[in-house]
Amino acid sequence: MQKTTFKPKFIAAFVALNLSPMVFAGQVYSGVDYQYFRDFAENKGKFTPGAQNIAVVNKKGESIGTMMQNAPMIDFSVVSRNGVAALVGDQYIVSVAHNVGYSGVDFGMEGSNPDQHRFGYNIVKRNNYKNDPTHPYMTDYHNPRLAKFVTEAAPIEMVPNMHGSTYSDLEKYPMRVRIGSGRQFVRDDQDNYHEISGAYNYRTAGNTFMQGWANNGEVSLSGDVRHPNQYGQLPISGSSGDSGSPMFIYDKTAGKWLINGVLRSGHPYQGKENTYQIARKNYLDEIIAGDLLTVFDFIAASYDWTADGKGSGRAGTYGFYPREK
């Protein structure tokens, strides 16, 4: 079975999503109210940040279990509104390098109310991962730098370990969730799919599948959206248009959510498997160190600011030099 790499090149994706009858789709189960997945992604209703023990019922009104029993509800404000990246530094995001169709991201609130502000941030450097002796992982990964600091969200920390098998430990990592805005479908009890929406109209979210294979730098999650798993009652599978969409994991020992990886590929027609690139903290640290190099020249003990009336000035006799690459 061929594995597909999801490429959200927006113009091409729009044409494909509207003309092809066999394109792949985002997958959730039709047996529970679709609003669960919408609210989960927007931190609305029962799914406000920090909420726990959230009851889930099916469309018959029957209880099918409780979400977020072992972790507080995550705050999804770190995810871009198009769902293809997450904020991991004051002005850095993480996604996959084959996402060449986006030049910026938005962060902020949803809705048309004037108080629901959101702002766009242009990408000024893509920082695509390059494989060499000191960078041993797959190249389909990047940490773009934004034009300015993001003020609508605080960045989320990355997982510290690149060994994928680490994250199958349900005692230490009891919960995983994912979010995205790829083309939206539901699957019925007979495993037939039905279209709900095209891509990039809104985000949906839920718990991930369980971990299958793993190696250094990647993890594969597999399952069936019709069946709850150990993570919860709202499994969701990523698909076409979801490349770069983030997966998060709860570290019970540290008591906080971390970004675990970004979606790279899978079998979206069946909605049964997704492969993620593990978040690379060392790579981000390397990028930041290269972008910001500060040098102080201590020549005098005084610091006097003198304006020249022309929009510039001089500060004493020692300097501060940020280096921009």
Role assignments for model-derived ranges:
Residues 2-11:
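Bacterial N-terminal signal peptides that target proteins for export
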Residues 12-13, 23-24:
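Cleavable N-terminal signal peptides
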Residues 26-57, 83-99, 202-325:
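C-terminal subregion of chymotrypsin/trypsin-like serine protease catalytic domains
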Residues 31-38, 105-168:
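Conserved catalytic-core segment of clan PA serine endopeptidases
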Residues 55-90, 94-108:
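N-terminal carbohydrate-binding/catalytic regions of secreted carbohydrate-active enzymes
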Residues 101-117, 172-180, 249:
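Short conserved beta-strand and strand-loop elements enriched in small hydrophobics
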Residues 141, 145-241, 263-268:
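Chymotrypsin/trypsin-fold serine protease catalytic domain
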